[in-house]
Amino acid sequence: MSIRVQKTFEALFELEEIRGIFRDSLPTGLSAEEEAAFRQRIGNLKAIVADLEAGTGTPKVTKIAGTLDVRSREEQYINIHPIQAAGRLTTEARKAIISYGDGYSTCDACRKPFRLDKISKPGIAEFHADLAKWLNMDHARVVPGARRGFQAVTGTLVNKGDSVIVSALAHYTEFLSVENAGGVIKEVPLNAKNIVTGEATAQKIEEVKTETGKLPVLVMIDHFDYQFANEHEIREIGKVAHQYDIPFLYNGAYTVGVQPVDGKKIGADFVVGSGHKSMASVAPSGVLATTKEWAPKALRTTAIVGDLTKRKFGIKEVELLGCTLMGGTLLSMIASFPAVKERVLHWDEQVKRSNYFIDRLLKISGSRVLSEYPRRHTLTKVDTTGSFDTVAKTHKRRGFYFSDELSSRGIVGEFAGATRTWKLNTYGLSEKQVHYLADAFTEIAEKFELPVTK
């Protein structure tokens, strides 16, 4: 680890030790013993900051709680991990975690009606309203990941034996959410370009109707899938669903938070997004948004009454099991939200950089793109069987040589040892970082005498 990065972490950790002194003290101030400990820690901090400024010193803290490594990949490397890119916390989110990391930190000023989305301090109620408006939906809730959004919708709409339409590239959590509700998965086949079309969706609905004698109860399709990150005919699919009067769930796990999403324009009855995948938030976090039509069902409140105590639980929402994100997860999402709203306006720039890198990769003979091309997303599946894998076949490190070469150039996030088909994501990289990334791949190719087109 770079000594300056190391010392930055040590300074942060030392400040937390100082913070602990205040937490253990009385409201009236520090005792003499605590004051001495405080001054000792301040001295330590000054020494760390001096090392940080000079770029000198040796590592003093290498583990957290004795077992956890200090995670510094975002500070030290260009990270192209396929699912980590858009979940990197903003500076404001990291500050929020420092301040709101305690368990029920959202609940300091919780008052009647005792529900998360009604809390005004901090501004959680306002955030929920802003979130719905931003997605052009009528209501929004935060959930522990997109998967819990799927689960809330399937729990509302799906009964045992009901059919649910999904993509042939659907994520496993979509499958599990249907299974959990007792439903049956019906997959829409892909066309030759690995795209789900509106026409194919209509055909699948007709097949289900013929086979079962009734229509599917839900159409749940990804805008961009997780395997290829291909863009599917989401608006056409929404229109088809409505023609059959079937509710449509728009899976925006790879869009909400990185590109503009207009739920009503898309024709979505439900919009589901991932906070930790695409909204610069701590995991597990996500969003579920819906319309006025479906809110009374999907966001229905409890009606159950205890037989002995006659207890009732007010306006807690059944499918969400009441309050959802009660601490740092939600506050990180709120803190990142201004930056997230701004960055979606620059999606085209991110896609342009993705295409720059892919264009450079394709100049290395034998490299292919398995995703649609030109790219419409920053997540891409590539095939380097004809390029970097030819080296792996005879290299003593096999495919791990490629990881070694990337790591030595400050690049991480590829699937270690993979030199055939693998995925990467350039989201959030600056222009100079994308150029550096492309140059690094070219350098590795040239080092091992792979043909490169200039």
Curated annotation (Swiss-Prot):
Keyword terms of this UniProt record: Protein biosynthesis, Pyridoxal phosphate, Transferase
EC number, UniProt record: 2.5.1.73
Organism lineage: Archaea, Methanobacteriati, Methanobacteriota, Stenosarchaea group, Methanomicrobia
Signal peptide (UniProt feature, chain positions): none
Protein name: O-phospho-L-seryl-tRNA:Cys-tRNA synthase 2
UniProt xrefs under NCBIfam families: PRK09331.1 (NF006810), SepCysS (TIGR02539)
Residues annotated for pyridoxal 5'-phosphate binding in this entry: 146-147, 251, 274-276
Catalytic activity: O-phospho-L-seryl-tRNA(Cys) + hydrogen sulfide + H(+) = L-cysteinyl-tRNA(Cys) + phosphate
